[in-house]
Structure formats: C-alpha cells, structure tokens
C-alpha cells in the first residue's frame, strides 16, 4: 500500500500518488473536443488546497463536503498551475463527509512563478535542441547565449568578433579575392572589403 501524500508535498511530475482530501468546491463542466466532460474541483487537507481535474462520470458524483481518497493519481502543470489528476487505474473513493480538518491556504494551484519559469526554460531548451545551430550555442557558456538573445553576437563582443563574422556573412567570392590582397605587402589601398575602405577614409 502506498503512503499518503499531503497536498503540500505534491509536486509536478509525481506519479502514483495517494492523497486524502475534502472537496471544497466543484467547478463547471467543460467539454473536450473528444466529447469528454472535465470538471475542476478545489480540494484540501490540513496542509493546504489544490485543484483536481476529474473526467466524465466521476465528476457527477463528487459533492462539496465529500471526503475522498485518491489512489494512483499524478500531478502536472496546467497553464502554470499545479493540478492533480486520476491516472490510469487511478481511483477516487468516498470515505466520509464533512468531518475533516483542512486549510484553504496556501492554495498550491495558484500560478507559481517558479513553475512558470521552469516551463518557459523547458520550452526554450526544446526549441534550441530542435535546430542544429542553436543546439551548439546552447552547450556554450551563459554569456554567448545572452549574446544570441540580443540578436548579433558581434554587438557585445566588439571589433575582433566583428571582423571574424564579416567574412562569414559576405559571399565567399569576395573573401577569396580580398585575402590575396592582404598577403601582398604593398597593396593595403587595394583591399576589396567594403568596410575597410570606409575605415581608412575616416582616418
């Protein structure tokens, strides 16, 4: 038999939960595209309250004041809010009414900034791993990642990276023509790079 979990100990991703709670409120029924009925109920124990999402006929039988034991449940985030669900083979069993010590606060289903930040980081990590170039940059230290967020990595790094990025952004034909001119000692004025003549003109 699994040990009972208090509402305060429920965390996203936990599975096979056994929770004893009292029903405080039963929410409105919403229908999914598949035709299932979903009802969100506010439940509580002595450590706090949380929302539970109940599907189909089970939701019709739940009433405020019912004391219920959830077995084989799991916890997940829904729109940034911690929510309990009945898992596969999970069960809601009414074991009494009204007589239970509970606390409505803290409400663990209120939007939690930590969970929202964690979800956004996970989404960014998935987006970066989806493309080949971003996955290489995501493995480098934090400052290059922030440079990527700013747009160009060359803006924050100064002229050395600007010079190194200029050949990669220009066409390869121009690079091969300008490189031999750099190797000739007497030809600094004949450089074909568009940016360098402007610099020499400013001096």
Curated annotation (Swiss-Prot):
InterPro entries with a match to the protein in the record: NA-bd_OB-fold, SOSS-B
Gene3D superfamilies, sorted: Nucleic acid-binding proteins
Main subcellular localisation: nucleus
Low complexity composition bias: residue spans: 129-140
GO molecular function: single-stranded DNA binding
Protein location: Nucleus
Superkingdom per UniProt: Eukaryota
Biased composition (Polar residues): 117-128, 149-182
GO biological-process terms attached to the record: DNA damage response; DNA repair; double-strand break repair via homologous recombination; mitotic G2/M transition checkpoint; response to ionizing radiation
Segments for region (Disordered): 111-203
DNA-binding region boundaries: 22-92
UniProt keyword list: DNA damage, DNA repair, DNA-binding, Nucleus
Any one GO CC term of the record: nucleus
Physiological role: Component of the SOSS complex, a multiprotein complex that functions downstream of the MRN complex to promote DNA repair and G2/M checkpoint. In the SOSS complex, acts as a sensor of single-stranded DNA that binds to single-stranded DNA. The SOSS complex associates with DNA lesions and influences diverse endpoints in the cellular DNA damage response including cell-cycle checkpoint activation, recombinational repair and maintenance of genomic stability. Required for efficient homologous recombination-dependent repair of double-strand breaks (DSBs).
Subunit structure: Component of the SOSS complex, composed of soss-b (soss-b1/nabp2 or soss-b2/nabp1), soss-a/ints3 and soss-c/inip. SOSS complexes containing soss-b1/nabp2 are more abundant than complexes containing soss-b2/nabp1.
Family that this chain belongs to: Belongs to the SOSS-B family. SOSS-B1 subfamily.
Protein name according to UniProt: SOSS complex subunit B1
Species in which this protein is naturally found: Xenopus tropicalis (Western clawed frog)
